[in-house]
């Protein structure tokens, strides 16, 4: 099977035949996070730490990374101010807390409580590996966390340990149950399949999730590993994921509008072994995120702020804008607004580039790994 790693025809608000707008943001635009291609960022991904307690093979080397010094990471007060500007001045409507692993930040509960007090209606979710979540889930819920996405790539200790380089499967499973008990739902599970490692577990993972009324989302591995070991061959593509699941289940595409959501969702029915036909009952849903083979860049609504306060308009951005440095220099909120707007205005069309995709010779893997950006 050949997968074209290009960018599909973009459904943008402006006339793409004219090329992108000038790289300087024109005067008179609304006070929103707009870019040259007509997209508006309303979904903020905020990394609260670069540290992590796992060493996933598709993310970082076995010996870990050089962590940021404590003084380089945003304080709780700085986070409150930056999020406040995003929500109150720039049209941010959703906030996702990321890492590294956010649970390793000691004041995480206090950070979320402060954000909730200032923004009572803001959906605040978190992406986590789940290690230690069972001990903090209730406190996080009480502080104002809405829901969680938990990364889980295998249900087998040996495979899990191979992928994460840590024997913590039991801790992650306890974290899943803790999140469910605390009401941090809907709980979603993110899984990355690696060829020859855990790809044959796809049906088992889905069965496990369906039994717990959890939405499982399979994500194509992206070239964001610190050791730069990503290859097209090693990536399990969306069509392959669909085929792996179809041996045991019938997947029926959810026709509802995705509205910028990355996952293509499917209703799941059991496949009868004898007839191959679908059963009459929908068991739940599964999502497939084809971030490489079928990218959704044209509908992207995300703006990212790293743990040290750098704005990244895209996971693959080659440019970063130092929002925290400007804040610490004594800048007024109006100056921070302008920098953030300028940073998003030059957001590339797709995968860090304006014209081509991951299959292009122009593509350059960013210096940051996923753990240093925030998922």
Regions found by a protein language model. Give the residues of each.
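Radical SAM enzyme core and accessory elements
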Residues: 1-34, 274-284, 293-375
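Conserved alpha-helical substructure of the radical SAM core
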Residues: 3-12, 20-99, 103-123
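Radical SAM enzyme [4Fe-4S]-AdoMet core and its adjacent flexible, acidic
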Residues: 5, 10-11, 158-161, 166-286, ...
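Electropositive phosphate-/nucleotide-binding environments in soluble metabolic enzymes
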Residues: 46, 76, 166-169, 199, ...
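Glycine-centered loop/turn positions within well-structured domains
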Residues: 54, 157-158, 295, 321
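Residues that scaffold the ATP/ADP-binding catalytic core of kinase and kinase-like folds
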Residues: 55, 59, 105, 158, ...
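A short, flexible beta-alpha/helix-coil linker loop
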Residues: 63-67, 155-157, 223-226, 321
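Radical SAM/AdoMet-radical enzyme domain recognition
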Residues: 76, 80-97, 101, 105-219
């Amino acid at each position: 099977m050949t997968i074209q790693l290009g960018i599909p025809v973009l459904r943008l608000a402006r006339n793409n035949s004219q090329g992108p707008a000038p790289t300087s943001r024109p005067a008179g635009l609304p006070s929103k996070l707009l870019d040259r291609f007509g997209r508006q960022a309303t979904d903020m991904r905020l990394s609260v730490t670069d540290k992590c307690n796992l060493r996933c093979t598709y993310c970082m080397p076995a010996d870990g990374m050089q962590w940021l010094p404590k003084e380089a990471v945003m304080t709780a007060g700085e986070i409150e101010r930056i999020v406040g500007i995003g929500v109150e001045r720039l049209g941010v409507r959703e906030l996702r807390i990321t890492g590294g692993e956010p649970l390793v930040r000691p004041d995480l509960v206090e950070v979320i409580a402060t954000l909730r007090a200032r923004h009572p209606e803001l959906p605040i979710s978190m992406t986590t590996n789940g290690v230690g979540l069972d001990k903090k889930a209730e406190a996080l819920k009480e502080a104002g966390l809405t829901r969680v996405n938990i990364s889980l790539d295998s249900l087998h200790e040996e495979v899990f340990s191979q992928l994460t380089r840590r024997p913590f499967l039991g801790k992650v499973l306890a974290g899943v149950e803790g999140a469910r008990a605390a009401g941090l739902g809907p709980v979603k599970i993110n899984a990355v399949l690696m060829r020859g490692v855990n790809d044959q577990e796809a049906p088992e993972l889905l069965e496990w999730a369906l039994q717990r009324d959890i939405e499982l989302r399979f994500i194509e591995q992206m070239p964001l590993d610190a050791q730069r070991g990503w290859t097209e061959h090693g990536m399990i593509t969306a069509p392959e994921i669909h085929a792996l699941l179809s041996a045991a289940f019938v997947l029926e595409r959810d026709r509802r509008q995705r509205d910028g959501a990355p996952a293509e969702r499917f209703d799941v029915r059991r496949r009868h072994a004898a007839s191959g036909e679908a059963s009459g009952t929908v068991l739940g849903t599964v999502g497939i995120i084809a971030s490489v083979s079928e990218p959704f860049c044209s509908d992207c609504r995300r703006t990212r702020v790293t743990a040290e306060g750098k704005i990244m308009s895209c996971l693959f951005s080659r440019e970063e804008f130092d929002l925290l440095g400007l804040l610490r220099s004594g800048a007024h909120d109006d100056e921070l607004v302008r920098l953030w707007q300028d940073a998003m205005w030059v957001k590339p069309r797709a995968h860090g580039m304006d014209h081509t995709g991951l299959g292009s010779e122009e593509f350059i893997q960013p210096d940051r790994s996923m753990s240093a950006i925030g998922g």
